[in-house]
Each structure stands twice: as structure tokens, then as C-alpha cells.
Amino acid sequence: MRTHDDTWDIRTSVGATAVMVAAARAVETSKPEPLIRDPYARMLVTNANAGVIWEAMLDQEMVAKVEAIDAETAATVEHMRSYQAVRTNFFDTYFADAVAAGIRQVVILASGLDSRAYRLDWPAGTTVYEIDQPQVLAYKSATLAENGVTPAAERREVAIDLRQDWPSALRAAGFDPSARTAWLAEGLLMYLPAEAQDRLFTQIGELSCAGSRIAAETAGNHADERREQMRERFRKVAQTLGLEQTIDVHELIYHDPDRALLGQWLNEHGWRANAQNACDEMHRVGRWVEGVPMADDKQAYSEFVTAERL
């Protein structure tokens, strides 16, 4: 259960979800024709010791094992992996376009195990700020350093909870509000209540000069009944395979009916926004997975929103 002042490291609560996402990137990277390449994802998963269930996701045969128990759940697992690859690719492209337009200041909110500061081709003079819980940032930087991995841009950690005064901490780390910025909120908004989401984007707007850009993944809107059905099916599959569920992701997410539509909100607050439904993006890049239970419900899918400050 979430509280207003809860905290975590890489093995617990919201922190452990970053391991799940990195596992999906590692699986995608190992494919013959990967949509994205993250050579550091696997080491970030295996060194986290966040639980057997996350490391099991690295197993290429996992979907086959799940399929023998529950075909729809297997399709959902494969869908989740594909979704993470599509999402990563979309935001990688966003950053490539931003730096091509001359932006040299990047802020990744709730960066988790995001390795873009290390794996993307950043132009000289680019500074990447990563904001997250202190223990999460410490784990990532230490693990990569111990394995001889160095950033491809100037990387600055801002170790603070986004519910605290992160704008002041960001400025103290050297952030320049007068310089155009490329912001990213990926895998974040579903862990915020509606009012916190509005406050976050208000703060971003206050720190963004004209020409700045933002990209964000919105929270999907699964029907309560369907969400509970899938939750129970995942639990049974994990139990059958002998995988201990160290966290329940559903308990970490805020299912808030009053949440603003992000694209619309940004258009009303000094940005020019566009939104791409994740379902459509998966079809566009050829990564749609057939047989998922929510295939007929576009509202169940997140949107990838991009916007430019006017």
C-alpha cells in the first residue's frame, strides 16, 4: 500500500518495477533483430537481487512455460515485453530528434534503471540530469561503474523524491531554465495521484523556456474487473512456476478517475502537444501481440505524449 511519504530502493516497492522494465529491455536486446539495444540492462537486473520473478523474465523460454499453464497470460507477458521495447524506442527517437534540433539539456524524471545517459549517442556538450530516489541512483551508477561503463554525456544525479522540492535540487545541480530542455516522464505517471501529476507538469512548465520539449507516457485505464482478473491469473501462474512475487504492481499504481488527459492539459498550459496511442504505435512498428485480453480496449493502453513549449 502506498503512502504520501513512502520510499524505496531498487529491491522494493516502485524501485523494483525498474528491474522489471530493465529485464524486458534485456530480452529485446538479445533478439536477432531487436527494436532497441540496451547492453547494460541485463547486468542491472542480475545485480539487483530484486527477486527470482524478475530474473525469470530474462528467460527467453518463459513465455512458453507460461503458455503451457495459461495461453492468454502468456500472450500478456509477451505483450508486456514488446510494449517496453516499443516505448523505449519511441522515447529514444524523441531524444534523437531533440538533440538534432540543438537541445543540449536533458532531464529524466524518476529515471530508475534508464541507461540512456550511457547508451545513446549524445552530441558534445550534452548534460543529462537524472532525478530519482537516492538509493536507486546509487545502485545504478555503482553497478555500471564496477563493470567499467561510463556515461556518453555529462551525467548529473539529482537524488530526491519528486514529491519534495526537486526543482530547487535540480537548479542546485546546475540546471539552466533559460536553456532549452528535453524532459522525459516515462513509467512514472501511473505511480502519481492526479493532483501530483498536475503539480509535476506545472513545475516543469515553470522551468521550461520556449522551444523546450517534453515526452511522457500516460497511465492506461484498465477496467477494474479486467485488472483484477489478470492480477489473479498472474498470481496463479507465478505460484505454479514456483516464482515468489516480491511486489504487487497493482498495489503501487494510482487508479485515479479524475486524472487529467495529459495532451489536453499541456495544450491548455502553454505547450503544443501530440499523443500517440501505444496500441497504434505497437502496430506501426510491427510489435503487436495477438491474443491479449485487452486487445479490444484502446482506453486500456497508455499514450505517448510529446509537446513543445510555446
Swiss-Prot record:
GO BP: methylation
Binding locations of S-adenosyl-L-methionine: 132, 161-162
Enzyme class: transferase
Keyword Transit peptide: no
InterPro entries: Ppm1/Ppm2/Tcmp, SAM-dependent_MTases_sf, SAM_mthyl_Trfase_ML2640-like
PANTHER family in the record: S-ADENOSYL-L-METHIONINE-DEPENDENT METHYLTRANSFERASE YKTD-RELATED, S-ADENOSYL-L-METHIONINE-DEPENDENT METHYLTRANSFERASES SUPERFAMILY PROTEIN
The protein's name in its UniProt record: Putative S-adenosyl-L-methionine-dependent methyltransferase MMAR_0357
Native organism: Mycobacterium marinum (strain ATCC BAA-535 / M)
